[in-house]
């Protein structure tokens, strides 16, 4: 059996150890030895964009928080008008380099698309600095509302974080939040912070059973 090969390593600002590993053509990003995402199972990352980018207007501007393996950015670009903009925010520089290097072909080189605008930084800061800017915001940060790998990401899923997301969206704008597991109280939290919220159970691997993830969507009311 072929071993997993470490292709790249990085430390996030809070000290979380990230690894890009490869085995027989499959790539996985791990956080402190726990798998976060895989090139083999990425359907939920694609759906994260499809759920809130399917009816975008000319000139639309969207934000993706968390680059991952690039699949959400690719899915958003596939739905974005020719004159639209997709702002991709990623905190860890090495993750960006991996997506420009060995990971690039898997999602069809989305960072090379002229509609992509790459921001290396904290998505929470990017959200707080925006007001009535985005038609859609997609967040694939950590494991979602819970359980968190890094506590620095908790703010995004609090009342204050959701209020900031709402403020960054245009009227009628939509947010999609990826979650590894269900969080029973999160729907009510979204609703009390001004969203018409829904929950979607999504297969990790299209057309197959097994692992399911949750995507919370909300429209700004």
Regions found by a protein language model. Give the residues of each.
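Short, basic/glycine-rich phosphate-binding loops at helix/coil junctions
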Residues: 25-31, 140-145
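Conserved SAM-binding loop and adjacent beta-strand
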Residues: 35-48
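Glycine-centered, phosphate/nucleic-acid-interacting loop/turn motifs that mediate DNA/RNA or nucleotide
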Residues: 173
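Conserved beta strand-loop-helix elements of the APE1-like EEP
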Residues: 217-221
